[in-house]
Amino acid sequence: MKAGVAQQRSLLELAKLDAELTRIAHRATHLPQRAAYQQVQAEHNAANDRMAALRIAAEDLDGQVSRFESEIDAVRKRGDRDRSLLTSGATDAKQLADLQHELDSLQRRQASLEDALLEVLERREELQAQQTAESRALQALRADLAAAQQALDEALAEIDQARHQHSSQRDMLTATLDPELAGLYERQRAGGGPGAGRLQGHRCGACRIEIGRGELAQISAAAEDEVVRCPECGAILLRLEGFEE
């Protein structure tokens, strides 16, 4: 296969564009803005989980408050009924003693329930303070998350612009190449490595491996427009004297 100096130079430019596109793709998956966003997102999710746990705990305490208040109300009504019976004078001595005993028990029960209710209300107040603090932290994290998302979007937009620019240049450059030469280059790239590299002294510019003397002599003896390949990696070797990358 033959490739004139102009074609070789275009191929070298194509290899440089592909290398830059590879670097752009790597940057897109290793953006510091992405890591920052993921960190804030993790903190935001953790705060959401804490808020959910606090809400569940608050609902449980609210249920306890309702139960205690209901029990206290029932005890109070029972006590009011017993006191009405005591003051009615329509009971005998034994009934009076039983009523008084029940009233004493109800008073102790009411006092115990009210103490328990007070303890739950105190816990509920502490929980409300935690919810308030967590809500403020969550609001701050929402703002941080929005800022991190914007920074990531801007970085991705910049990368997309660079990718589009280099891809457009690549398309235009590929159109100028001999189809057979372009096909060889693409097949080499499909193997996972660079499709072409400049011969730099004794070293292949694609794989950076030094070429043996015997093989280098064969490469040097080939015609200037003869397409030669690296004996190590198979990349097209571009022999371009005086051409700066």
Curated annotation (Swiss-Prot):
Offer a single GO CC term for the protein. Answer: plasma membrane
The membrane-spanning stretches of this chain are: none
Pfam families for the chain: CT398_CC, Zn_ribbon_9
Q: Which residues form a coiled coil?
A: 33-176
Q: Which UniProt keywords apply?
A: Coiled coil
Q: Which InterPro entries match?
A: CT398_CC_hairpin, Oxidative_Scav/Glycosyltrans, Zf-RING_7
Instruction: Give the top-rank taxon of the lineage listed in the UniProt record for this protein.
Output: Bacteria
Q: Does the keyword Coiled coil apply?
A: yes
Report the protein name in the record: Uncharacterized protein Rv2229c
